[in-house]
Design a protein with these regions (language model features):
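Accessory N-terminal region flanking or inserted into the helicase ATPase core
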Residues: 2-46, 50-51, 112, 116-196, ...
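P-loop NTPase Walker
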Residues: 1-109, 515
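Helicase C-terminal subdomain and adjacent C-terminal extension
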Residues: 523-570
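Inter-lobe coupling/hinge region of RecA-like P-loop helicase motors
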Residues: 11-31, 36-44, 250-258, 279-351
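Conserved helicase C-terminal RecA-like lobe
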Residues: 394-533, 538-542
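Catalytic acidic motif of RecA-like/P-loop NTPases
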Residues: 196, 200-204, 209, 227-228, ...
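Conserved helicase/translocase motor-coupling segment
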Residues: 315-436
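Conserved RecA-like helicase ATPase core segment
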Residues: 208-305, 310, 540-548
Length: 570
C-alpha cells in the first residue's frame, strides 16, 4: 500500500469517527436527559429503535422490575418493535393497548362484560341503529370522526350505549372509552417507569389527548417526523399535533440527525425535494430538522449506487407492452446474491415496488407469469366496513344468545316483524326473546350448518437464495424498507394528482417512498399508459439532475437487450 493510499484510509477513518461521535452525542443527549416529556424528531431510517433500546436498557439498569410501555400505530411496526424490544417492554399498537386496559380494568370498561367482543364493523351497525331509533333523522352522524376529535356529546354517548348493548367494541371507540374514563379520573391511569411512542405523527387528536393523560403519571418519549404524515384523510392525524408538541415549552425537543438506512444519493434527493417543495410554498410550518447521510454505515453502498435510475418507457400496458414489469424483472435478475442474503437474513424485502393500484396490478401480473412469488395485499377496498351474513353466523356459532349476532342477521334479512318494530326491539336487552320463534329456529338451523372458511394459508416464500418481492401502495410503504426500491407511475395526475394544486401529503408520499431504499432506487414513468398520454411527475424535476441516470425504454431498446442476453447493470 502506498503512503498516499494509507493516508487516504486514515483520513476516511478519522472522518467516520467524527460522524460516529456526532451521532453518539445526539443519542447521549436524549438518553441522559431527565426531562419527563421528550419529543425526538427523527427522519426515515434515523435509528429510533436503537435509541428506544438504549432508553429502556438504562431504565432497566436502574430498576430491574421497571414497567415499560411502547406503542405505535402501524401493526407491522409493532411486530418489528416486539422483535427488538419485547424483553425490555410491553409493545402494542395503541388500539391493542387500549383493548388490554379495558379487559383489565372494570372502571374503564364500565358497561361492558369482561369478555367483550371486538367487531371492527360495529360503527356501520350503530349507524343503522341511529336511523332506526331516530326516525326524524335519517342521516347518521360520523361517529368515528367525532370520537377521533375527542368530542364527548350525546351523539358519541349514543355510540357507547349501543356498544354496551352489544357487548362489543371497534377500534376507535376502545380508545375513546379509555380517554373518557381517564379524563374523569386521571389517577386511574397505570404508571410506567417509561412510555415510548413511535410514529407520533400518525396519532389523531383522541389518541394524543389520551397520551397526554398517560404522561401525567409516567415519563414519556414520543418520536416521529412531520415529513411522514400520510394518514390525515384516513384517520384524522395532522401535522399540527407533532409540530405543537415540538414547540411546546412542556416538552424537551431533540433530534436524531442521520439517516442510517439510505445511500448518499437518496438522502441528497430527499433534501432536494424538501427544498423545492418549500420554495414552491408547500410544507409550511415544517419542523426544521437535520437529515444527513451517514458514511460509517452507508459509505460502501453509496459508492456502489451513486445515482437514482429514472426509467421512461414509451408505453405501459398488459402483455408484451408491460415495460414496467419487463424492466423490473430484468433488474431483479441482476441483484447480487449477497444483497439477497442480507435482506433474507434481516427479514425485510429484497425488492419493494411502490405505486398506485393500476400500475402495481400490471407489474404483478408480469412477474407472476415469470414464476416470481410476490408478497402483495389482496385488494379489499370498501369491504372492511361491509357487514356480511357470515359475520352474524360466526358470532352465533360461538354464542347462540349474542345480541350482536342476532342484530346482524336481522340487518341482513330485514324481516317485517323487525322493520315494523325496530325501535322497540332495539331498546330491549337481550334481543333474542324479542325475536319470533320461527325466525330463531330458521337462523339456528343455518348456524348449525355453518362452517367457518379455513384460515388463509400463509403466503409461500421463495427459496432462500431467491429475492423476496413486495408490492405496496404509497401509504402502506410506511415502516418498510428494501435493498432495491421501484417507484412506479410517477406522473402528473397520479403523484401529484394536480400539479397546480399539490397537497403536502403527496410530497410526503414521495419522500417516504424514496427513503425506503437501502441500496438502489428506480423511478419509473411512461409516456402512454393503456393508450392515454402521460407526463412525468413534476416531483422528478425537483431532484437535482446530477443525481439521476435516465434511460428511455421502448421496443427497440428491449429487443436489443434481449439479443445481448445480459441483465441491466444495477
Amino acid at each position: 500500500m502506498s503512503k498516499y493510499d494509507a493516508k487516504q484510509m486514515s483520513d476516511t477513518k478519522h472522518a467516520e469517527d467524527q460522524f460516529e461521535r456526532e451521532l453518539q452525542a445526539a443519542i447521549d443527549l436524549i438518553v441522559q436527559s431527565k426531562h419527563p416529556k421528550k419529543i425526538v424528531v427523527a427522519g426515515p431510517g434515523a435509528g429510533k429503535t436503537s435509541l428506544f433500546k438504549k432508553l429502556l436498557s438504562k431504565s432497566k439498569l436502574a430498576n430491574q422490575d421497571a414497567s415499560h410501555l411502547v406503542v405505535t400505530f402501524i401493526s407491522a411496526l409493532a411486530e418489528e418493535l416486539k422483535h427488538d424490544l419485547s424483553e425490555l417492554a410491553d409493545v402494542f399498537t395503541f388500539h391493542a393497548h387500549c383493548k388490554q386496559l379495558l379487559h383489565k380494568n372494570l372502571y374503564l370498561r364500565e358497561g361492558l362484560i369482561e369478555g367483550f367482543r371486538v367487531f371492527p364493523k360495529l360503527p356501520s351497525l350503530i349507524k343503522r341503529d341511529w336511523s332506526l331509533l331516530n326516525a326524524d333523522d335519517k342521516d347518521p352522524p360520523h361517529f368515528v370522526n367525532l370520537m377521533r376529535e375527542a368530542i364527548d356529546s350525546d351523539t358519541t354517548r349514543f355510540f357507547i350505549d349501543r356498544s354496551n348493548y352489544y357487548d362489543a367494541v371497534s377500534f376507535d371507540d376502545m380508545v375513546f372509552r379509555v380517554y373518557l374514563k381517564l379524563a374523569a379520573a386521571p389517577h386511574a391511569a397505570e404508571r410506567h417507569e417509561l412510555i415510548l411512542v413511535d410514529e407520533y405523527q400518525d396519532f389523531n387528536l383522541l389518541e394524543i389527548s389520551l397520551l397526554d393523560l398517560l404522561s401525567r403519571k409516567s415519563p414519556i418519549v414520543v418520536a416521529g417526523d412531520d415529513d411522514q404524515v400520510l394518514y390525515g384523510a384516513l384517520r384524522s392525524s395532522n401535522w399540527n399535533f407533532i409540530r405543537s408538541c415540538y414547540s411546546s415549552p412542556d416538552c424537551e425537543a431533540c433530534q436524531l440527525p442521520f439517516c442510517l438506512r439510505c445511500p448518499e444519493v437518496v438522502v441528497n434527493a430527499f433534501d432536494d425535494v424538501v427544498r423545492a417543495a418549500t420554495a414552491a410554498g408547500h410544507l409550511k410550518g415544517r419542523i426544521p430538522k437535520v437529515y444527513r447521510y451517514f458514511p460509517p454505515s452507508k459509505g460502501r453502498d453509496s459508492a456502489a449506487h451513486p445515482k437514482l435510475h429514472v426509467i421512461q418507457t414509451s408505453i405501459q400496458k398488459n402483455g408484451m407492452g408491460n415495460y414496467f414489469g419487463r424492466v423490473i424483472a430484468e433488474v431483479v435478475l441482476s441483484i447480487p446474491a449477497h444483497y439477497i442474503k442480507v435482506s433474507r437474513d434481516g427479514g425485510y424485502p429484497t425488492v419493494l415496488i411502490i405505486g398506485n393500484k393500476q400500475y402495481l396490478t400490471q407489474v404483478s401480473a408480469y412477474l407472476k407469469e415469470r414464476g416470481y412469488i410476490l408478497d402483495e395485499k389482496v385488494d379489499t377496498e370498501g369491504e372492511e366496513d361491509q357487514i356480511k351474513r357470515e359475520d352474524g353466523l360466526k358470532i352465533l356459532k360461538e354464542d347462540a344468545g349474542s345480541s350482536l349476532g342476532w342484530r346482524i342477521m336481522l340487518e341482513m334479512d330485514k324481516p317485517n316483524f323487525f322493520t315494523q318494530a325496530a325501535a322497540r326491539m332495539l331498546s330491549t336487552k337481550p334481543l333474542v326473546p324479542m325475536i319470533p320463534k320461527a325466525y330463531r329456529d330458521g337462523v339456528s338451523a343455518e348456524v348449525q350448518k355453518f362452517e367457518e372458511p379455513p384460515a388463509k394459508t400463509k403466503q409461500p416464500q421463495p427459496e432462500f437464495a431467491k429475492p423476496t418481492i413486495k408490492l405496496t401502495s404509497f401509504q402502506s410503504a410506511k415502516g418498510l424498507s428494501a435493498e432495491y426500491v421501484f417507484i412506479v407511475g410517477l406522473h402528473d395526475g397520479d403523484l401529484p394528482k394536480s400539479p397546480n394544486k399539490i397537497n403536502d401529503i403527496e410530497v410526503c408520499k414521495f419522500l417516504v417512498a424514496l427513503t425506503r431504499t437501502r441500496k438502489q432506487c428506480y423511478l419509473l414513468w411512461t409516456r402512454r399508459f393503456a393508450g392515454v398520454p402521460k407526463k412525468p411527475s413534476m416531483f422528478l424535476n425537483w431532484i437535482d439532475r446530477s443525481r439521476k441516470n435516465s434511460t428511455y425504454v421502448d421496443a427497440k431498446y428491449l429487443n436489443e437487450r434481449e439479443k445481448q442476453g445480459r441483465p441491466r447493470t444495477s
